[in-house]
Amino acid sequence: MHQFKYHKGTLHCEEVNLQTLAQDYGTPLYVYSSQTLRNNYKRLHEALGDLDHHIAFAVKANSNLSVLRLLADLGSGFDIVSGGELFRVIKAGGDPKRCSFAGVGKTTEEIRYALEQGIYCFNIESLAELEFINNVAGSISELAPVAVRINPNVDAQTHKYISTGKAENKFGIDYEETMQVYERASALPHIQIKGIQMHIGSQLTTVSPFVEAVKRVIPLVKELQQTYGIEFFSIGGGIGIVYEEALASGPSNWWSEQE
């Protein structure tokens, strides 16, 4: 449950009158509920129960320092796609050792910075990127921890422009080529194999695509555990918001009554 409620016809966030905030600070104005963020994090953490799990917030979703600081205090890790995002996480008190560096456009400077800060893992998108990261790590005598992002060829049942897990999508290594990439990674002197990652899309409003993708990848995960001792399987993708149902909920005159 979120903490945005109407009280005597005026919208409040927790106990704060949003009309007063708008008058004091002007509009447009972004207001975040710390209690909602805490509750949602707690619900996800508790839903995973006794499983050995790690929650990583995607900084690209919201890089506000106060939001990042709150999540860091809760123990969250972070998914980053740039050196700038890593800088913001560190500034907010986040632990680089709980950060995974994703994305296809990592620069030499960003890779060096991430290695110097001791990030947990790079998610690599191609064999060429694997070789590139190995070379950068070697130039500063470091060992780069990596996970290969695979494409499981699963339909995320989301908008075609934010689907990333089908064979025709541009992201990740083809499922059938995965073991070849890990074999190459194991031979590179400045690469440390950490795990495996998939990301099938954003704005998913049903868990069935996750289930299908996990079932498809699990045999590969087991083989990688036996062969290379991987530490984790990252299940990427964003749980979505059902906007239409949210707007349609309640009696038809609800909106007019709030004016």
Predicted regions located by residue number:
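C-terminal active-site-proximal or functional interface alpha/beta core segments in diverse enzymes
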Residues: 205-259
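Glycine-rich tight-turn/loop motif centered on a GG-T
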Residues: 23-30, 116-121, 160-173, 206-210, ...
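A charged N-terminal "starter" segment
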Residues: 1-144, 183, 187-192, 223-228
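Short beta-strand segments
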Residues: 58, 145-151, 197-199, 234-236
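Non-membrane alpha-helical structural segments and their capping/turn regions in soluble enzymes
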Residues: 34, 38, 108, 127, ...
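Conserved radical SAM core fold
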Residues: 64-67, 85-87, 108-110, 152-168, ...
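Gly/Ser/Thr-enriched, mixed-charge loops and adjacent short helices
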Residues: 184-209
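Metal-dependent enolase-superfamily TIM-barrel catalytic cores that perform enediolate-based chemistry
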Residues: 115, 129, 136, 168-186, ...
